[in-house]
Swiss-Prot record:
Residues 1-339 are annotated as: A. Residues 340-555 are annotated as: B. This is Chaperone protein HtpG. It comes from Haemophilus influenzae (strain PittGG). CDD domains: HATPase_Hsp90-like. GO terms for cellular component: cytoplasm.
Amino acid sequence: MSQNQETRGFQSEVKQLLQLMIHSLYSNKEIFLRELISNASDAADKLRFKALSNPALYEGDGDLRVRVSFDADKGIITISDNGIGMTREQVIDHLGTIAKSGTKEFLTALGQDQAKNSQLIGQFGVGFYSAFIVADKVTVKTRAAGEEADKAVLWESAGEGEYSVADIEKKSRGTDVILHLREDEKEFLNEWRLREIIGKYSDHIGLPVEMLTKEYDDEGKECGEKWEKINKSDALWTRSKNDVSDEEYKAFYKHLSHDFSDPVTWAHNKVEGNQAYTSLLYVPAKAPWDLFNREHKHGLKLYVQRVFIMDDAEQFMPNYLRFMRGLIDSNDLPLNVSREILQDNKITAALRKALTKRSLQMLEKLAKDDAEKYLQFWKEFGLVLKEGPAEDFANKETIAKLLRFASTHNDGCEQTVSLEDYILRMKEGQKAIYYITADSYVAAKNSPHLELFNKKGIEVLLLSDRIDEWMLSYLTEFDGKQLQSITKADLDLGDLADKESETQKQRDEAFGSFIERVKNLLGERVKTVRLTHNLTDTPAVVSTDNDQMTTQMAKLFAAAGQPVPEVKYTFELNPEHHLVKKVADIADEIEFADWVELLLEQAMLAERGSLENPAAFIKRINKLLG
């Protein structure tokens, strides 16, 4: 008999997710069982952990399991566990809302492409709501461990905008999820179909999955029913890696991560000695939807002596490797370990160092063995890996080897060039690795600063990710070679520089008075004015000194709301350009000023992508064209 019944509306994001899921996941329906069994496994893990300090929570039943049964006549499948269970408040929090920041924005971003939506929703993690892929009504009966039998809760919904919740009596702790299948989903009301799905997705979770099977006597007559364990239910990571197949590793990854895609690669290691632990690390194929969300939870599952302790233990991985998935099972940490204890712990620090090294080795091996797969990985996680040089000084050189960039060596904008590739192609006498940063690949590719390098056939890395400038403030050299921006006024090409000819010397002297006129006109608005022979097609550029903040870094500061120090540019003019020659011959000071201002504004526009006063620029162009 239910009491205290109320009907509540789903959070708007839940409604939207349910509709998207029903229409986008029709080709992958069977994952509902994987998700619900994974939830049951999590509930068992949480009970084990809480029972460490309060054994009474077991209520005399410490054999944790999940049971799957079906009734073909009634059209229902039931998934029951004897795990931690839920209170009424927890039911409303967990089954009526999605407590993930950024969910609304994520759902809004989903388009009409159902195949793409399927993949994105898989990255989001649908969990309990996957039940509605096959069911037109879902009933949940649950009682939290340690609560009285009359403190159980009944939750029910048809997935159409609202749900009901009521108090009921339930003798056993844990949760029963009852699925009332749609008419066209009756294929799942079959013992062998359910066994197949459980074997495929849940064979190696650390919890027995049982099904009710018929018993027969010696004469072959049905004589009853019994619960039969149908999965291996061993902790996969405790087995020798030689005894685990690739398919088993992939299936376990999907259980662990709730991801739909296979991982790119994985590493399974058992370490003995001062630190005894087992790790199983995976590199995902796709970035999670909230990878760059500050509140995004990441980290490894932590076990101590095979006992689950916590999800998302971020203390074992640096932030720039937050995309890594997997688990660590330590023999040395105490069973009562907390996040606070992990924060300042020598064992944690040693494990973090070892797991970081292992993760980087996995990526190095992937880059070496399968360049195509590595580039797929780079497209998904390259921006995150670029955080590494600033965060991890000890592994900076290793991280630098894993970075990929666009370059003038290639035609496209794909980031495929490593620093090692670049060094192999360096010109004789070249001492630095040259790069340029810009707002976009197109802006970098067409920068006038490239003209001399293109003429000499010197490769330049084209950097256009927002993080690049910040990364390069920490990554200043690689393999003994300085990384040098080609937009700097004090750029030194060393042996690659052209020797000044007598003709150039005479021309420069002839332009001396012109340079002085420009300096007097611009005054304090620029640091200095000078001639340059680094341009071929462009009349003028602006550049900064090595000790000054670059244009891109100034933009980063401004975007972050930080105060931006004034940047004074060096104004460089090309004496061989016909426009500069024309301006140098203008006697009228007003006309001269207009042309100099125009050249400066053009150079500033090419460097910064914008002007402080675009209206004045347009007015000046119109005046000079008229």
